[in-house]
Amino acid sequence: MPLARRVPRSILSWPALVVTFAAAVTCASAINYQDNQKGALYQDYKGTPYQDSRYQGGAQKIPGRVECAYYDLGGEGVAYHDSDAKNHGSGELNHADGTYLNQFRMDEGVDISYTKFHDQIDNNPFNLVQPPENQLYVGWTEPGEWFNITVQVARAGFYTADLLYTSNRGGTISMDLNGKDASGPLTIVSTFNATDPIAWRQWHHWNVARNIVRLRLPAGKNVLTVHILTEGNMNLAYFDFKKAR
């Protein structure tokens, strides 16, 4: 489970398609977090770092880029909570055609898609930053959804992170460390732009939230939980963690 808490849901799209996104909730887990001593959560946690035929990196590294779509293995109630069991990106918006990106984790409830550079979908003139092409992201988020990411922290200390995201109407997220709230509510600024004539593209205006979170992290393996708190309608690609100054 997450390490327990709350959140919203995002909308992603494709020509004439407005979708929603999934990723974080307040929910208790099969984990024991009573004293939150270092290692206690990780020892009891039933999820495992993501891996597949292409990604064999194990726990995601901090400092470094932490990919949201590489949330942990373990399923609903352990590695994530989503408002429904259907992946509205992989296998639905992105048809199941046998390709890696279109079918990425399509049997899981977290809604996932990837950036597309045709028809000015994700390489559009309304971006505040240009995202990488074929960048996987968690989308269709709704309040109450969450997902866990196991990370390997090189050295104990304070870290800040930038977030690559889109948000049709703003909202808030939060981040837990080993089952305890570590961030409080974090404001996501809306990327809505009324001058874009294409309605569905409001879910594809990319931006970076600089230093959106500051965490004190112990060295070694830790579990981060991303919660969607309010609004949803966000696409969350990755957090870039660096040592705080």
Locate each region found by the language model.
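N-terminal secretory signal peptides that target proteins for export/translocation
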Residues: 1-11
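Generic low-polarity alpha-helical segments
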Residues: 1, 24-28, 72
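Bacterial N-terminal signal peptides
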Residues: 15-26
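Extracytoplasmic
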Residues: 30-245
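Serine residues within intrinsically disordered or low-complexity segments
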Residues: 10-13, 29
